[in-house]
Amino acid sequence: MTSIEPTHLGKKVIVGMSGGVDSSVSAYLLMKQGYQVEGLFMKNWEEDDTDEYCAAADDLKDAQAVCDKLGIKLHTVNFASEYWDNVFEYFLAEYKAGRTPNPDIMCNKEIKFKAFLEFADEILDADYIAMGHYVRRRDIDGTSQMLRGVDGNKDQSYFLYTLGYEQVARSLFPVGELDKSEVREIAKEMGLITHDKKDSTGICFIGERKFTDFLQTFLPAQPGNIETSEGEVIGTHQGLMYHTLGQRKGLGIGGLKNSNDDPWYVVEKDLVRNVLIVGQGGNHPRLMSNGLVANQLHWVDRKGPANGSKITVKTRYRQQDVPCSVTYDSDDVLRVIFDEPVAAVTPGQSAVFYDGEICLGGGIIDALIRD
């Protein structure tokens, strides 16, 4: 492990301690760099907060154990009200409108880099905040850029595109310079209880329960027909909100007569007729698009790429970058044309743009371009 010179003596950093290995190692690395480190554990969810589904109590216990091991103070804060108003209600509204939202992106925007930063500033007198995200910060020409994490498989810039350079400048991302395996090795060397803790996956407020059961608690299901792209009814669905474009599993329509062995995919959701439209093969023509229109734009530098720029885009997490060209229909509407057709571009999800290793920002996919 590389030794780090303590060059930041006296600067106070509040680390978002989640009870996971990434935030644990972030706190340790910042201590080694000479920062005055304190932890802050966020409780963001209370509805149906039972032992069966919610790991918050265990996560807090692990966060406290790590802070005790490192000899730092751990604060706690309850952002459940802010989370409900700014993240969960958005999540429900998007599903109700037939789109597929990404609540993790909204959580970063409204909670981790807004409510958390404000609390760290006003209550804890922080110079910086820090999170266990796999991204990097680069300060250049008086501003701060956000770069992809070194570990390409764990890079989380897709989830942080709504940050402006002002927030990036106030944030530290120690594990963004490391591979995940290195992070776990550091945690093990330091004897941190989280060194072999499983990474959290899925949507935080759903936990281990079935997504359909959870969603039905808040939005009544509206069953309807499943049709092929040729218009033949071949099954029923329990609600369009349970399905997303490109979905293959859970359709319950295998082994049909007069069809080949290719898997079925969701290729369209007809909201007017409440019909789920499916087609066979991952390259089905109705699954492909030549571009997209994005709105609700956020640019890290607050300006965005120039009109006509050739850059790259991700339309979902861990997707290979897609070369594209971009033009503005207005200040808040961007038209994106892919160099090659892309499958399963999904309205409601985010399109995030890159110039090499620099995350430029992004927007919400509003419409697909198929011509």
Curated annotation (Swiss-Prot):
Protein name, entry field: tRNA-specific 2-thiouridylase MnmA
Gene3D superfamilies: Adenine nucleotide alpha hydrolases-like domains, HUPs, Translation factors
Chief place of localization: cytoplasm
GO molecular function, one term: tRNA-uridine 2-sulfurtransferase activity
InterPro entries from the UniProt entry: MnmA-like, MnmA-like_C, MnmA-like_central, MnmA-like_central_sf, Rossmann-like_a/b/a_fold
Positions of ATP binding: G16, M17, S18, G19, G20, V21, D22, S23, M42, G132
Region (Interaction with target base in tRNA): 102-104
Top-level enzyme category: transferase
UniProtKB keywords: ATP-binding, Cytoplasm, Disulfide bond, Nucleotide-binding, RNA-binding, Transferase, tRNA processing, tRNA-binding
Site (Interaction with tRNA) residue list: H133, Q349
Stretches the record annotates as Interaction with tRNA: 154-156, 316-317
This protein's GO CC annotations: cytoplasm
Disulfide bonds: C107-C204
Designated gene of the protein: mnmA
Record-annotated membrane-spanning stretches: none
Entry superkingdom: Bacteria
Cell compartment(s), UniProt: Cytoplasm
Keyword DNA damage: no
Catalytic activity, as annotated: S-sulfanyl-L-cysteinyl-[protein] + uridine(34) in tRNA + AH2 + ATP = 2-thiouridine(34) in tRNA + L-cysteinyl-[protein] + A + AMP + diphosphate + H(+)
Family: Belongs to the MnmA/TRMU family.
Catalytic residues as annotated in Swiss-Prot or TrEMBL: C107 (nucleophile), C204 (cysteine persulfide intermediate)
Keyword check for Cytoplasm: yes
Function: Catalyzes the 2-thiolation of uridine at the wobble position (U34) of tRNA, leading to the formation of s(2)U34.
Organism in which the protein naturally occurs: Shewanella pealeana (strain ATCC 700345 / ANG-SQ1)
EC number(s) from the headed UniProt entry: 2.8.1.13
Classification via HAMAP family: tRNA_thiouridyl_MnmA
Annotated GO biological process: tRNA wobble position uridine thiolation
